[in-house]
Amino acid sequence: MKEFQGPIAGEHALAEYEGWWEREGKAISSAHDRAGTPWLQMFDVFGKRVDDVQCAPEYWSMLRKGFKTGVIWRAFKEASLLSSFRIGYICSFYDAGLFCPYTVSLSTILPLSKYGAETVKASVLPKMLREDDSVWQGATWMTEAGGGSDLGRYVETTARPVGDGWTLTGDKYFTSNAIADVAVVAARPEGAAAGVRGL
């Protein structure tokens, strides 16, 4: 690939990431795969309602490795998706399912950086672009019972401005990356035009 693409930005980081998968990641992925899926913790030990999605610690180890390698922040620092997709290629070779949180995080940060309110961007983007374990994950919550990828036709969730935010009313049939810290949600403001431009 290097012969066709020229020098690879972050080549050392990519080699280190692949090496990590060979040394540790494969075994973690295999063990996590056998251990089962995440589970919902509805209450803490004191009976307080928490509704927290729990994953094995090893899962977080795998996930954070890709974030720290730059699957998100490199796309912005290098003004290109190439390194991000190269990291994703390595990740997908070893654990295809793990690439999903990365792609939906990109699908969150890109429209947010382009269309988000300045106050939201100032609050959220720095957290999603961190290069350490405290990085925020993103999610996209679009699909409704009508289904399909035609958001303009099938999104019935409404958005009503309330104070500094919005109240959303509706149901999502599928949401990606339920363990995310922030989500982009498709909704139609009350009185907005039909079609995708009204979302």
Predicted regions and their residues:
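A short core secondary-structure module
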Residues: 169-199
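N-terminal glycine-rich flavin-associated loop
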Residues: 103-119
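Secondary-structure capping and boundary motifs in well-ordered enzyme cores
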Residues: 35, 54-55, 79-83, 100, ...
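Extended, charge-enriched "interface" segments that sit outside catalytic cores
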Residues: 1-77
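Buried hydrophobic positions in well-ordered alpha/beta secondary-structure cores of metabolic enzymes
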Residues: 108, 140, 168-170
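Short, solvent-exposed loop/turn segments at the edges of secondary structure
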Residues: 103, 135, 152-154, 178-180, ...
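Internal maturation/activation junctions in enzymes
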Residues: 116-166
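Extended, domain-scale alpha-helical bundle/helix-rich regions
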Residues: 76-108
